Amino acid sequence: MSDTTNVLRPVAIAQAACPLLTGDALVGLEKYLADESRRQGTADALAFPTSTAAVAAAVTAAREQGWPVTISAARTGIAAGAVPNGGLLLSLEKLTRVRGLRRTDDGTFLLHCEAGVLLTHVQQSLRNGSFPDSADWDAESLAALEELKGEHLFYPPDPTEASAAIGGTIACNASGAHTFLYGPTRPYVQRLQVVLMDGRVLDLDRGAHLAEEDGTFGIENADGTIAWGKTPSYLWPRTKSSAGYFSAPQLDLIDLFIGSEGTLGIITEAEIRLVPAPETNCAVMTFWPDEDSALRFTRDLRERRTELGVEAIEYVDRNALGMLRQRRDALGAASGVPACLPATAGGAIYLDIGTATDSLPAVLGELADLVTAVGGYPETCWTAIERDERERLRVFRHALPETVNSIIAETRKTHPDITKLGTDMAVPDEHLGTILAIYREKLAAADLPYVIFGHIGNNHLHVNILPRNPADYQKGWDLYHEFAQTVVDLGGSPAAEHGIGKLKTDFLETLVGTQGIQEMRAVKRLFDTDELLGVGTLFAS
């Protein structure tokens, strides 16, 4: 144990005042008690800290009261992780400063953000080459900003909800369509500042603190003693996953916090890695006679993703295309669905391409050849190069979940307890066809209406079950659980990008087992002795 790189040493800091709103002061602030899951929570107090020091003060006060603490920011999550079960709701929405920029010796640019900074703000500022907060930056950051202006960089993680906050995306290891090429949030996080429930602060730099080969690591207590523990021993799924604490040999301890969903500590600041952006972007929509040909096309694209600059592969199945045609018939041009949607297509695949400008014609030619070779309809492909054209295709893609939501909203007028049942599951490459066949067989046998769409490049398809009545809803929920077990049996994850939150805690146990849950809770107790942080998230209350 002479090597202390596996010991984390949080420090006490001078705390700043952070008023807690209670009683009548909470009236009119009900929106903070819910997120996009539509679940409504309760809170004894609400705080809006403006600094790490204020966060430390707020959690110290909550701990003295014995209150649980729930973290919130943009409230874009759909698994109810930001929905409080009493106690203190800690909103980080005022932690909105981009604090600086630095360039490492190897030329990498790292952007220093507070947790409440929105993804949209980061991406827009990078496109503009300027940051509103730069007037307060130090000389090193200003020099790096001047160098940045000669580059074309971006931050790759792209969850569907672009108004998500940086801290929230890190807390659930967010991913999106472009995860196919660039991966999820985790590899782009270089440094974190984290407030623990005792008010002390951890600074975590990637590569600075690694667990031992057997998973052993420690955290220094306030009295100087070391509390020892082990990282989880379960195998991480061979797919994208946002289910539970990360596990890997000699785990970099920063990775415990990425994807921990606000249950180990409160992320207040982060340094995120920027990478070169493609010179030009293009969106392509391809149409297919049947699902088998669409799957063959997907497999071929996987083999050539780097060569062709394929950033995303998204699927829309036959049922979903039929739903979009009905939307077009009902709403016309306002539907966002083009009138030229092929009437006979049995599936569609959308691609995002990022490449060098002078390479784009050749890339599009190779794609057309590939579509023809696999049996698609090259003459019906849609290609969008200009920003406004790509935006129209984006609107078309988002018309599908909007249509699903409108159908559920209509059903809820008669059956208000019904909600959408949408899966968030991924399997390894070799099992894509298998899981699709299982989905269709089980859904047909249950006589449930559904559509399938999503990130086919990562074998991460969303099955959206559309229950017509309470009986359908129960059958759909039972199938949802059955699908989760099947996906785990195939080596996949039942929570690929949205996290576990408070809604899918049983799926986490399906994935890691009883022993895995015990190992995770042991890790949690090292950082949160009284288990007050994120109560009900990951682990059932």
Tell me the role of every PLM-derived stretch.
Residues 1-64, 76-110, 119, 124-134, ...:
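N-terminal flexible segment immediately upstream of the FAD-binding catalytic core
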Residues 20-25, 47-49, 68-73, 80, ...:
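General beta-strand structural signal in soluble alpha/beta enzymes
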Residues 26, 30, 258-477, 486, ...:
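C-terminal substrate-recognition/cap domain of FAD-linked oxidoreductases
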Residues 83-96, 127-131, 176-186, 273-276, ...:
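A glycine- and small-aliphatic-rich helix-loop capping segment at beta-alpha/alpha-beta transitions
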Residues 99-101, 115, 119-120, 124-128, ...:
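FAD-binding subdomain of flavoenzyme oxidoreductases
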Residues 490-500, 529-533:
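Alpha-helix capping/hinge segments and adjacent helical runs
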Residues 505-541:
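Activity-critical C-terminal alpha-helical subdomain
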